[in-house]
């Protein structure tokens, strides 16, 4: 059959005369005017259903790299395009969300009541032992959010790379193994990792170092705390061993602020056997000597605990550990460290933060404890409940 004959029959068929214009209009609409979704996509799905990795994993990264840069929001409606795979802007449904924080509670039965906990970690070095310990916590992961902040330095870049790899393995696993949400920040303020291990413990750099750390903690806290957060657990990146029931054990006390006792495992060369020793001396009770020293200081001076140059004679929780004692025994405190400290979210919401300036001659976590007490919150510690700090290698 010749082409001319086929063309003649098509022109004479009334259905063809109707179908071709309709098809042309439909194609023009799809290409130029269709707004909701494209007909093309991955795995047979529409492009509007396509998600970036951070959306598939329910993992939220702040835009520290182009790879994970979040789309900018615009109220202008974007026209669809046949080959456009742009992900729709991520905004709350309806643009406005209402939360009644009066219904948000922090109780002694946190897991039973499905209370959300936010675990926050400033991280200058990624330790696999820290991550492995985090994964062995048996609090429901759908109730756990993680927040990290890394410095903009070479060590911070390395820590970030290792952290991202570890996160991807978990957040692409079975849904039951994924954390509710993960946020990574790159520090905008002064970096907190300028010094090596021995240098960062020197007395003459404490004010600068602790101020930088306070800024990092505040950036991390205020960028991650959400309307569903009931508890905030400050867990240092150097903490590599805790009981699996850490969160349940600490929330059970139902305290506004509660600190675990930070110890360190090491090999005792004299006794030729493994042993433990106290590590964190920032969990303390105030003393008359400490108050007297503070009264004689200038406005910009701070007291730093654990140094012979400033003998405050404060009772340090690290020295109250009793191997035969009850793990749940409580001790009233006036200062806390940030190694493993649980805080009711309402304490932070009420304004207790980490001062990067001398606050009653205290700074960072110890200043936070003072601020919380000024807000009429009580501070406690668990002298017989041990968690372990990694043993430093760069002595």
Curated annotation (Swiss-Prot):
Pathway(s) this gene product operates in, as recorded in its UniProt entry: Protein modification; protein glycosylation
Keywords of the record: Endoplasmic reticulum, Golgi apparatus, Membrane, Signal-anchor, Transmembrane, Transmembrane helix
Annotated TM spans: 18-33
Localisation per UniProt entry: Endoplasmic reticulum membrane; Golgi apparatus membrane
Effect of residue 236 to A: Reduced activity of the M-Pol I complex
Protein's job: The M-Pol I and M-Pol II complexes possess alpha-1,6-mannosyltransferase activity and are probably involved in the elongation of the mannan backbone of N-linked glycans on cell wall and periplasmic proteins. May also provide alpha-1,2-mannosyltransferase activity to the M-Pol I complex.
Listed name of the protein: Mannan polymerase complexes subunit MNN9
Lineage, top ranks: Eukaryota, Fungi, Dikarya, Ascomycota, Saccharomycotina
